[in-house]
Design a protein with these regions (language model features):
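Short beta-strand elements in bilobed, periplasmic/extracellular small-molecule ligand-binding domains
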Residues: 96-108, 193, 209, 213-234
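N-terminal helix-turn-helix DNA-binding module of bacterial transcription factors
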Residues: 1-65
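An alpha-beta-alpha
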Residues: 177-221, 324-338
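Hydrophobic alpha-helical segments within soluble ligand-binding/sensing domains
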Residues: 168-194, 231-239, 297-317
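Alpha-helical recognition/docking segments in bacterial nutrient-uptake
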Residues: 1, 5, 62-181, 240-246, ...
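Short acidic capping loops at alpha-helix termini that bridge into adjacent secondary structure
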Residues: 189-190, 223-226, 271-277
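Flexible loop/turn connectors
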Residues: 238-344
């Protein structure tokens, strides 16, 4: 396969070589270039598979030993951006130290510019890239483009990756199932699943819902349609509690949703867990402050971060991709938001 040169990108984009150089180098002069031209050049570079010379030199000679990180902090509404992604970032910084790496290079994500951004990961500054999945469509596109580059890549929080990409994820299905099994052991038989939006547009939340369903079915309990609530609203919570057979526990697919549910229940003068038990998922940094101490499925963020760093360094060293794919177990953090169901 012929090496794509800067002049090829220029011809494809219909601009001069100097314009391509300014745009792809990120020089200050490119600020005078119209945005539509910048986007066209970056798109051409990605489509042609252009790789800056610095990358080839780095791969042939020495490595920087620096790891790039792409997080989804811009795509998560607060306060989730300050909890889950913040925890991942701290975990990855600690993981770099554990793996004796000098540090991480964090790449801010620009909205709607996944294709345009690919070239910045290929400038030779980093030896490999970690991509934390938060918005599947964007990450799928980014991973697909990077899969054809020489840059080793490991995805965090997804298993839907190209053949050349490693990953680290947790077992979302088993985690949700464990949470429901705990409620069943306490005596609950009418357990609602309350989510802010339909499956959050992410496969993980579908897996959590399926884990919820299967745990009930395994106990010969058929999940009822009215137990599945989309949208955390006062009237919807009231409807759950006014069913002919009211629910006695609520499971949410993340802790932010659990906090919103807790706020509504408390505004209705209901007590957690005396009136309703509540379980979340993630075990975010403030989970112990939700509902007097939220029982939740714990994602081992530090372990995920270390494993991701190890998987990536293994890929950089030439290990097979299959050896850089890991699914970790979750655990249940039991606190104060669950109790046996109230006597009817």
């Amino acid at each position: 396969m012929a090496v794509v040169k800067m002049r090829d990108v220029a011809a494809h984009a219909g601009v001069s070589v100097s314009t391509v150089s300014k745009i792809l180098s990120g020089s200050a002069a490119s600020s005078q270039i119209p945005m539509h031209t910048i986007e066209r050049v970056r798109l051409s570079a990605s489509q042609l598979g252009y790789i800056p010379n610095a990358v080839a030199r780095s791969l042939r000679t020495q490595r920087t030993r620096e790891i790039g990180v792409v997080l989804g902090m811009e795509t998560y509404p607060e306060p989730a951006a300050l909890t889950l992604d913040g925890a991942f970032l701290l975990g990855l910084i600690n993981a770099a130290a554990i793996c004796h790496l000098p540090g991480v290079v964090v790449y801010p994500r620009e909205e709607n510019s996944v294709i345009a951004d690919v070239s910045r990961y290929l400038d030779g500054r980093i030896d490999g890239l970690l991509v934390r999945s938060s918005t599947p469509h964007q990450e799928e596109q980014l991973l697909r483009l990077l899969a054809n580059s020489p840059l080793p890549v490991v995805a965090i929080w997804t298993q839907d990756v190209p053949a050349t990409v490693g990953y680290v994820d947790v077992d979302h299905f088993a985690g949700a199932s464990q949470a429901i099994q705990y409620l069943l052991e306490l005596g609950h038989r009418r357990i609602a699943y309350v989510e802010p939006a339909p499956m959050f547009e992410h496969p993980h939340f579908l897996a959590r819902y399926q884990g919820y369903q299967q745990a009930l079915i395994d106990e010969q309990i058929q999940p009822r349609p009215e137990w599945h609530v989309v949208g955390i609203e006062r009237e919807k919570m009231r409807a759950l509690l006014r069913l002919p057979e009211p629910i006695t526990a609520i499971f949410t697919p993340n802790d932010i949703a659990a906090g919103e549910v807790a706020t509504i229940l408390q505004s209705m003068h209901l007590h957690i867990p005396a009136d309703v038990s509540l379980v979340g998922f993630d075990d975010i940094v403030n989970a112990h402050l939700i509902a007097g101490g939220l029982t939740t499925v714990h994602q081992p963020i530090q372990q995920i971060s270390v494993q991701a760093m190890r998987n990536l360094t293994a890929l950089i060293a030439g290990a097979p991709v299959a050896e850089s794919r890991t699914v970790l177990a979750t655990s249940l953090a039991i606190r104060n938001s669950c109790a046996p169901p109230p006597v009817q």
